[in-house]
């Protein structure tokens, strides 16, 4: 359910670059705390690497068909938004799962009490607390700009992505 419902919800909220529901990991089978953290880092790291590859393509592939530039630029921004969103250090996000193996059991128990509602609190905060969404999108803007994004192309890509508003 979450693999389909969450992506549609995120698209309706304006295209935040998130995949579906989380993948279950049997953490008790992984002996090293560092490996547990590394597994949780794999998702955001893959989004970051993909964003870097897109940035390199946009910057150093001069013969690319110009019609692809808006879509690739927008996709890069979606990847950066996925990195930053998933690194939020609250459960059930990857940012928390990276830290979780190193937390004291009492602290983990306190966080686990709210695991089921935290995502909704974060989404509501993004929706209703301008400071939080502004801070997030400023981070997305800054990291994307470091990768050389042309924001005129990003806006054009967003407009094409939201085809239902045309």
Descriptions of predicted regions:
Residues 1-166:
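Hydrophobic transmembrane alpha-helices and their immediate loop junctions
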